[in-house]
């Protein structure tokens, strides 16, 4: 069993499902609102490891969907500066277990890292609202 520090956007359906899967797998989850953290470039950077910069950005963020932010055009410092100012741009969830940190919820990677139960909950990485105009009920206009 792992103690998972889990940064989410409350009301996000996938974050809710991801936490439920972690708990069902025997892990303890300490959830925090990603928007309420005092992020800096230095505190954010370790969560992204060697992932390409474009994968650091939440593709369902309103500014990405509107074309205002183009993840593939950003370098590391630009991406970090944008995410520090607008936490909705951060790919969720951010998770930490001990000194190991990661972003997103690739089920196979999380299973290899801390272990998950065998049930298949379906796609819990891609925002189900991304292909529609649906907004999460928790906060209109926020992804």
UniProtKB/Swiss-Prot annotation:
CDD domains: ArsC_15kD. NCBIfam families: nitro_assoc (TIGR01616). Signal peptide: none annotated. It comes from Rhodospirillum rubrum. It comes from the Bacteria. The active site is at residue 12. Belongs to the ArsC family. InterPro entries: Arsenate_reductase-like, Nase-assoc, Thioredoxin-like_sf. This is Uncharacterized 15.7 kDa protein in draG 3'region.
């Amino acid at each position: 069993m792992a103690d998972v520090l889990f940064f989410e956007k409350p009301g996000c359906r996938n974050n809710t499902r991801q936490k439920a899967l972690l708990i069902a797998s025997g892990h303890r989850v300490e959830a925090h609102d990603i928007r309420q953290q005092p992020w800096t470039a230095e505190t954010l950077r370790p969560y992204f490891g060697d992932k390409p910069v474009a994968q650091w950005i939440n593709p369902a963020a309103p500014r990405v969907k509107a074309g205002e932010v183009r993840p593939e055009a950003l370098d590391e410092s630009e991406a970090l500066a944008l995410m520090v100012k607008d936490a909705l741009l951060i790919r969720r969830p951010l998770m930490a277990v001990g000194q190991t940190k990661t972003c997103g919820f690739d089920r196979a990677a999380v299973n290899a890292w801390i272990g998950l139960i065998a049930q298949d909950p379906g796609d819990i990485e891609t925002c189900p609202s991304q292909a529609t105009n649906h907004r999460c009920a928790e906060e209109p206009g926020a992804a």
